[in-house]
Amino acid sequence: MNPISLASGVVPEFGPLDTIKAAVAGGFDAVGLWIEPPVWTPQLTRDVKRALADSGLPLLDVEVIWIKPQSDMSEHKRCIDIGVELGAKNVLCVSSDPDLSATAARLAELCVHAEGGGIRVALEFGVFTEVKTIGMARAVLDAVEHPLRALLIDPIHVDRSGATAADVAAVPPALLPYAQFCDAPAERPDPQDFNAVIIDAIDLRMQLGEGRLPLHAMLRALPRDIPLAIELRSKALREAYPDACERALVTGRATRAWLRSAERQAS
């Protein structure tokens, strides 16, 4: 069964220490954390390192580096530095810079900064960004030409951008250190309606098997046993389970049940 990580988006109203506790309570194999460099302190780094050590959970990823036309690269690099100090395996990046050559240049700069840190720089595509499709993302990464570059697949963004599992299967496995996973309704928001796109991404995701995304095909298209960050941003889930640990437990159980079912179907 694929290792599963509690993505920070499942518990967005909670800080990193509570997120780690929730990942433990939910029976996850790893955890992801949201990093805010302007308010992140050395004491918080020490506290998070201690909490991770006590939990025994690896830190699958930290997020988010959001590349913009006037990006403060020093702040982005600090996000990487914090991730490296915490032992993160990946840092998640998105871009709202319409100049894709500039995005590639900044990603390359971040990859160089990450050298020796044991961390990959993963670009996520989606219609809410300027890297809207898997093809655009691959073109950016081809321009980066650095071994630490990576591509982050999220089924909802694959579907909403009009891509398919076949497009995912065509990605070189070396570019896929991990993936996000969730389900979602069949109805796609109008890609020109930014608010609808954002609501779809942060409020309307669903437990695996409860929506209409082709998750079995998507899982088969990904490298075998790839770690899955369960990115279940759901208003309904937040309202039904205001406690972070309970929310993580429900999500972890549903995820493992679906993965067991997927394994049976594949055998």
Model-derived segments and spans:
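A short, acidic, flexible beta-alpha connecting loop/helix-capping segment that sits on the rim
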Residues: 11, 227-246
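Acidic/histidine-rich catalytic cores of soluble enzymes
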Residues: 30-31, 112-212
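Alpha-helix-loop-beta-strand connector modules within alpha/beta enzyme cores
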Residues: 45-65, 108-122, 143-144, 213-220
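N-terminal pre-domain/capping segments
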Residues: 1-89, 146, 150, 181, ...
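Active-site acidic/histidine proton-transfer and metal-coordination neighborhood
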Residues: 17, 67-151, 160
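Generic structural signal for hydrophobic
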Residues: 22-23, 52, 83, 110, ...
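Acidic-and-aromatic substrate-binding clefts and catalytic sites of carbohydrate-active enzymes
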Residues: 9-16, 33-44, 66-74, 96-103, ...
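Charged helix-capping and loop-helix junction motifs
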Residues: 43-50, 73-80, 103-111, 134-139, ...
